[in-house]
Amino acid sequence: MIYLGKKLLSCTLFVYFLYIHFFLLKQNNFCDVKVRERILEESINNDLSSKGENLHIYEKTNVSVQTFIKKKERKNLSDNNINDKINNNNNYNNNNNNNIEDTTYYPTGNEKKENIFLKIFRYVKNWFPIKSSNNLKKTNINYEQVQEENEFSKYILQNNMSIETTKVCLIGSGGDSSHDLIKQFLLHNNVKYNRNYENDNSLNNKSGSIISSYKYYSEEIIQEPYIIDRDICNKKKNCKESTLNYENNPKTLIGNIIIQSDILKNEKIFNMNRHFVVCKYFGSIPKTNIKINQSTLIQHLIKCLDYCKMEGVQYIYIGYNIYAANNKLIEIMKKLREHKIIIVTSSGKIYDDDNNNDNNNFYNDNIYNNNIYNVHNDDKEKIKNHIKKKNKQNNYLYEYQRTQKDEEQKSNSSLYQNLENVISISGLIYTDSSKKNKNKNYIYDNEIKILDQKGNKKLNRNYISLFYFSYDTDIYEKIESDIIDDDHDLVSASFVNTLVLMHSINLKLSLGRLRKILNKSIVKREELRHLSNRAYYHDMMNTFEDSLNQRKRSYKIFYLELKNNKHKVLLSDANLKSMYQDNLPVNYNEEDHVKHNVEQETSVERDIYKNNENSNKNRKMDMDEGKGTYIQNKESHKYNIHYPYNRIKQSLLNDNTLNHKPYVSFLNMSYYNEDIEKRNYNIYDDPSYTYDQGITYDDNYYIDDHDIHTRKKRKISYDGEDNNDYHMYDDRDNLFHSNLGNNKYEDDGNVHREKEKDLEPRFLYDPFANIENRDLETVQELSELREKKSNNFYSRNHDNSSNMKRRRKEKKKKLKKVLRSKYDKIGNLERIRRKKKRRMIHKNKINKRRNMKRKNNELEERRNKQADKNSSSGNGKGKINGTRNSPKIKFKR
């Protein structure tokens, strides 16, 4: 007994030693963080193309909600090769269908390198129900950073951060108004709806105030199978039969895009400026409960895509993966690509099961197989016969002839590999380890299989672009995970909401720029630690920050065009129009200032417009494609500006990247039009006196108002005539009119620069001229001024309006100021030189005296030295030093 006790004690100590050792190992290798973030990566297909390269999953209890998005590469293919590529992909998928039942397990790279002690530790730990420590939360990624980004995303959704309304088309089965979260969302937004006692699930939206607005378009089967009644929908855009509720697809995706469950659980509302266009393509007959198959879904999908294109949406979200390919679908996809519409396919899947299953099986298997529709063989024959008769009578249906290839082709969103505007998202589908029979098999082609019969991890991922994990439980604990039925729906909805919000912040964000921003926000793989071999963390804050920076950069360029003293190419009218589509928030209170300036400029602009109406008939002055004139009556106070002062929308976003406060408001177009107007009326001045493009100026914002502006002459070419245009600064309304000269105007209204050889400055005055010639130059300048007084300041149309006289007087005064300032500068320079000359003369006299005195002293010293030498040698010569002019006595011994 003692011996057995010692052995038992030693075994116990050894087990505890292993437990402590691997507990520390677990802290460094594994994660217990509950996060809801996304992962994004390019070229996932190349990484996981080889056999056996499967994604590492820790345990079956560890698969739940966590999202990692994978985005595939798009190849630029011609339209002719799209059909061939799709067919090749479908043939490849059909070849893999024969190997569906293959349950061989290929271990991943991490599993091959797995330590044997770790396996023993897992086996021993299952005996002890020990909970994991909370300190493990910081072992993966950066827990504080994740929490900060979650708060940042909630702040964006809870506040209206969008600039412009984004139109999104949702194609699916609708939403569930009886759901607690959706019902709570509707109550928070004060949406008025009436319950239909016959059908409690129906919801009639009267106010249309869910977030922004909704528009419903029904492609449901109303009377007979395979027949879509569009008469009511054609007469009224909102069909009577179209409601927010779905009918037979509980795993809806639309409701998850409209709401955010995490925010609603905290009883908070998020505001996003979006306009939803909902097209319902799922449907069934309540009496017969006959389900539709893939050919009907393709017809419904084509009609919904066409309807979304007519509504002018920016994004289309399809509630299921494109199942089969036909010519009509490819044609509509090409049209959407031409309109630059981004299409997102969800992670839900539709498969056509040809097995003989009862309708009851559909409801019994609703837990894991909600997206699979089964049809009786007898019903199929009835439907086919019914279609042949109805297709001859109805012309409003798209012609769709089912062929043998259509029956064989099965692809998981094959269009996304060939069309760059299609983004396909697929997700992990949690399946139980219990196997079904052949008629109830849940393993399909291109579907990720997590578990096999033995409980091993297996991954079969062909054309999969999204997968997700959960870290709700410890990987060593036998605790069931919280499996949500519509996890993949939430994944797709979250990704679509991210794209829509990026577009709402920056309307000019193209597909290429969007891909670059998403790729730039990927965190390095080293920071993920042991999260996954193939996973990349997507930094949400960087995504929105880059979107805002792109928007700020476009506005900053426009600032430079109006405020910078360097010569830059001006923007065209089309670019200016697109710039002003964004309602830039104002950092200071300029509502009253803009209103006062608009009213103050009315009288002056009206006089200019009336006096030169005949000369501007052919010129397009309005910036909004001819929808309004430049100046209207004073009583109406309606000017052609994209965002008037009474429509300024204050936003939470402020562009603080600029170092100065602009005088020119993005909300008002009259200032820019005024510059064009003033330049246009100067083309009739005398071409003998011109100014140069290379004029320099200093704004009163940068330099004091009393500084003197040096004027240079410039030359403007417009239809072969020289233009006399002045670079003015009007102190009356604090508006700075930028230098718009030295440009040629084409027929399309774009501004183009002259060549560099025409930009050489030609000065009225030479700043390095000799002082002796200043009088001659002044006389010449005054003579030129007298000539201009009689000739140059009169326009060819001899206009005597008060405005033109005022402008001429201002030009004369400014020219005189230039002459006086030039003469004063020359005089001041001469005075300074005279003072310097007097100082030099005085210094020369003093130096001359010093030199003479120094020479006399040296001469006397030499003479005294010579006398001393003579006296010492006995020559008898000597010298008597006395006063400066004392007589010198020479003697001999």
Curated annotation (Swiss-Prot):
Q: State where composition is biased (Polar residues).
A: 791-803
Cystines in this chain = none
Annotated compartments: Cell membrane
Effect of gene disruption? Answer: Ookinetes fail to traverse the midgut epithelium resulting in a reduced number of oocysts in the gut epithelium of the mosquito host A.stephensi. Gametogenesis and ookinete development are normal. Growth rate and development of blood stage parasites are normal.
Q: Which UniProt keywords apply?
A: Cell membrane, Membrane
Q: Where is the composition biased (Low complexity)?
A: 869-882
Q: Identify one Gene Ontology CC term for this UniProt entry.
A: plasma membrane
Output compositional bias ranges, type Basic residues. Answer: 804-820, 832-854
- The segments labelled Disordered in the record are 787-893
Which spans does this entry mark as compositional bias, Basic and acidic residues? 821-831, 855-868
Q: Keyword Cell inner membrane on this protein?
A: no
Give a short account of what the protein does: Probable inactive serine protease which plays a role in ookinete traversal of the mosquito host midgut epithelium.
The entry sums up its family as follows:
Belongs to the peptidase S8 family.
Q: What is this protein called?
A: Inactive subtilisin-like protease SOPT
